[in-house]
Amino acid sequence: MAALAATAPSLGTAGNFAVLSAAPLHGGAVTCTDGTITGNVGSSGLRASVVQTSCPITGSIVAPVSAKVVADFNSAYAAYAAIPCGTFLTGTLAGATLAPGVYCFTAAATLTGTLTLTGSGPWIFKIGTGGTGALTGTNFNVVMAGGGNPCNVTWWVAQAATLTDSNFIGTILAGAAITLTRGTFHGDALAKAAVTITGTAVTGCPATKGHGEGDEVHCNQGVGNGPEGCDPGNSNNHNTSNDELGGTPGDPGRQGGNGTHHATTASKRK
């Protein structure tokens, strides 16, 4: 089955995160229990939080993320929403084989079984193009055939995305919460509400080994204005460091303190 091809919009600085809770103003929250996350993790808002319980994270934790990250996520979400549908789908997608294109569900999608993607992408799936609709996957597996890149798969969801006992491929942009329970997830989980991960191995897209443009990272024993590009801050005092998160200037700490800085390398997605 083929569908109208499209160019995937840029995620901007939001694409630097494997997991992002971009909730407006208050309530950004990422919770991970008995899982793993490979990539950066971010949460937005005045009460931003990232809670780990037996969940190692390979990457930076940023809470709160900058306003630009949230704005880039919202822009990308709107851009995907505006992409015309190529083929409308119904059913669970069990046993389906899909070439690159834009595939749409007008309402909610409940998915099970195995979906095979052939070619090199991109694949764009839109759930709830009629205005409302959640993505629910149970024992749902996505596999690549023909050497396709999991990072060329995007799932735009009008409301929440919930995956249970699934081996999922693709980046989710959700209009509400994302919940991942047991299984594997290869892509970025980006939501306008909370992201809850339980017993799931999340591998960001790509697994972040460096930092992209606009990605905030915490300084680690860097000399102020030295090799790590950190401003002098009050050592080990994030709230009063002279950083990019709006803290008040503190006394220069030994070897630079715990300020933050913006990396200047190229973004992993353009």
Descriptions of predicted regions:
Residues A2-G214:
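Solvent-exposed adhesion/ligand-recognition segments of exported proteins
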Residues T264-A266:
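Intrinsic disorder/low-complexity segments enriched in small, polar and charged residues
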